[in-house]
Design a protein with these regions (language model features):
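Sec-dependent N-terminal signal peptides
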Residues: 2-13
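Carbohydrate-active catalytic/glycan-binding domains of CAZyme proteins
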Residues: 5, 16-339
């Protein structure tokens, strides 16, 4: 039964980048917490959290995959030659890769489960294919006085550079925050000038502008409990990166329990979330990459959650993003158009 189900869920393999249809997942076995950037060479590069894929090759120090069309992805290599050494224990999680001043910056989290002082670091490469050279720590949780400081996200606005971050905690100072970076994007001049935009029940912040609004997409609940994972994505919007970000009901995301549902589990996939920036294709359609867990095959041999890479189209209705049925697509769908 499981084999039959898996065969139905394998991505369609047709003629190549000109395919007119695709089917989830678009990459497996794992590309968790994905980020995507388009290189000067015309390829899309996606990156994921450090993970052991269960293939005997050990833990990959931020896997890199690439594609011409967001559908057919090929493994490239690990982003790092050696692991960043500014922290004693932990993994390299939730990388965010962007082009800054002609270089490729990777803002990443350095953490382990239950870490009392995780932090955010920076690595830089000349090419999106790496290798990325570590620049060290930007800040840790104690420095910035925000518990569980992970999941960084980079944003430029009005000529200024910012990093946003945050994850789950019930402590009063918890939440999703932003702070201005230096002009070169390599440091934080004043951590005391951080500003809060969302409550402590969000993580995996992604902010992107469309029209007059900035849209906040964040993930809630459990990311990594195999087929029982309850991760899901909620959205709010604001006319300013400083907020307030309000959901469809007008509630501020700085209040717990808010956010308009964008994406949640279905009978086949659990825990869809931690999306990348959406990508606009040549037809003007927006596409969202994220990870999810196939309930019928939720883990690899090492015990890691089998968080596969997923792709779905964003539609817009009255100024709000939607995904069909607010769940991962299962059937063949029209593919992104790239000429």
């Amino acid at each position: 039964m499981i084999k039959s189900l898996l065969s139905l869920l394998l991505p369609i393999v047709l003629a190549g980048p000109g395919d007119k249809e695709y089917k989830n997942p678009v990459f497996e076995p794992i590309l968790a917490d994905p980020t995507v950037v388009k290189g000067d060479d015309g390829w899309f590069y996606a990156y994921g959290t450090q993970d052991d894929w269960g293939d005997g090759k050990g833990s990959r120090l931020v896997p890199i995959v690439r594609s011409k069309d967001l559908v057919h992805w090929d493994y490239v290599k690990e982003a790092f030659l050696t692991k960043p050494a500014w922290k004693e224990k932990g993994g390299i999680w939730a990388p965010d890769v962007v082009k800054v001043n002609g270089k490729y910056h990777m803002y990443y989290a350095y953490s382990t489960w239950g870490d009392v002082n995780p932090g955010v670091g920076l690595a830089i490469a000349d090419s999106p294919a790496g290798p990325f050279v570590d620049q060290g720590k930007l800040f840790n949780s104690q420095d910035v006085e925000v518990p569980n400081s992970i999941d960084p996200f980079y944003l430029e606005e009005n000529g200024k550079k910012y990093v946003f971050w945050g994850s789950f905690s019930d402590k009063p100072t918890q939440g999703t925050y932003g702070v201005e970076l230096s002009a070169d994007g390599k440091s934080v001049p004043d951590l005391s000038k951080k500003f809060k935009i969302a409550a402590g029940d969000f993580e995996a912040v992604m902010i992107q502008k469309k029209g007059e609004y900035f849209y906040f997409l964040g993930s809630k609940e459990s990311c990594c409990e195999y087929e029982k994972s309850k991760y899901h994505v909620r959205v709010g919007r604001s006319r300013s990166i400083f907020g307030p970000f309000l959901d469809h009901d007008g509630k501020d995301l700085k209040e717990r329990g808010t956010g308009t549902l964008l994406l949640h589990s279905n009978d086949v996939y659990a825990g869809p979330g931690h999306n990348a920036r959406w990508v606009t294709d040549d037809a003007g359609n927006d596409w969202l990459l994220y990870h999810a867990i196939l309930k019928a095959d939720p883990r690899v041999s090492t015990g890691a959650n089998r968080r596969v890479l997923m792709l779905d189209k964003l539609s817009w209705k009255n100024g709000w993003p939607e995904i069909s049925n607010a769940e991962p697509s299962l059937e063949n769908r029209p593919a992104p158009l790239f000429k």
